């Protein structure tokens, strides 16, 4: 019953998200609006590949942000918004599949509390990030990707906790979990995926490993449309790139879950760690270059008259 209610709420939110996005897209692609130089075909491929790998366990945010930065496909300051807007629908598809197939029944108060916390965090985080200047976003994403690479490395090397048997939390432990999921929802708006830190949190709280999936999937599926709303409203994303991620991503999810199901991904995960670390360094270097250029511009600015 609780699962059905959750899936119904997700369906309503997803439909609302699509409707709002279409309204804004009609304005974006009106005859008078400036034309984007982004090409749709590569974005479809990125959406397919990133969400295919996401369904198999390699995060779509790390892959997408790395590809965008390495190949210069989307402006640095538009990457967080583009990922949150574009990956929202494929993530909803993942959530419908994984929550619908969930074998372990997570206690409803725990599930709802953690999802709600992530959603509020996303709303606050997106409202903040969507107003940040380019340099601050570069620094934030650089740090976020570095942290994400460390989490992936910990997963590969088996450093992460193993979990327990609990199917729910109460009292102080629930409050702690809610607080941290709020923070994870906010941080996702910068590009650090919620899955890995949320999974670690659930394991540290002594919960069943399988309980992580409905909580993670539910949190991301609900928080991404909410965060996406703010990026769409502030026009801090690439519309054409986000469309490509969404359209290409859903078939990637379906193919990975229903056809491929599993792959030997150890070497892929190692490659992703190195690529993400390199991308993190590139973003921080870009931020330093931007800062130096601003300082140089200020030093050469003419002094106000009368001094």
Mark where each language-model region is.
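Juxtamembrane transmembrane-helix boundary motif
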Residues: 1-50, 99-190, 203-204, 209, ...
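Short amphipathic helix-loop junctions that connect adjacent transmembrane helices
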Residues: 69, 199-206
């Amino acid at each position: 019953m609780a699962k059905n209610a959750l899936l119904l709420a997700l369906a309503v939110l997803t439909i609302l998200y699509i409707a709002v996005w279409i309204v804004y897209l009609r304005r974006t692609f009106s005859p008078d609006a400036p034309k984007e130089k982004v090409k749709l075909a590569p974005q479809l491929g990125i959406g397919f590949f990133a969400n295919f790998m996401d369904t198999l366990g390699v995060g779509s945010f790390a892959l997408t942000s790395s590809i965008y930065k390495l190949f210069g496909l989307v402006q640095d300051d538009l990457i967080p918004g583009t990922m949150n807007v574009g990956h929202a629908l494929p993530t909803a598809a993942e959530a419908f599949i994984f929550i619908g197939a969930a074998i372990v029944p997570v206690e409803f108060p725990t599930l709802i509390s953690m999802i709600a916390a992530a959603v509020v965090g996303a709303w606050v985080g997106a409202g903040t990030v969507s107003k940040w200047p380019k340099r601050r976003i570069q620094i934030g994403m650089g740090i976020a990707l570095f942290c994400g690479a460390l989490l992936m490395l910990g997963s590969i090397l088996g450093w992460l906790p193993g979990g327990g048997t609990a199917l729910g939390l109460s009292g102080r432990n629930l409050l702690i979990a809610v607080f941290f999921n709020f923070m994870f929802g906010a941080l996702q708006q910068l590009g650090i995926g919620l899955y890995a830190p949320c999974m670690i949190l659930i394991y540290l709280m002594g919960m069943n490993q399988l309980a992580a999936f409905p909580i993670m999937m539910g949190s991301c599926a609900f928080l991404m449309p909410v965060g996406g709303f703010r990026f769409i409203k502030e026009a801090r994303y690439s519309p054409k790139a986000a469309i490509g991620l969404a359209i290409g991503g859903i078939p990637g999810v379906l193919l990975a879950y229903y056809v491929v199901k599993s792959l030997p991904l150890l070497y892929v995960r190692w490659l992703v760690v190195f690529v993400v670390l390199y991308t993190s360094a590139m973003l921080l270097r870009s931020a330093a270059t931007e800062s130096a250029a601003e300082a140089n511009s200020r030093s050469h600015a003419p002094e106000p008259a009368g001094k």
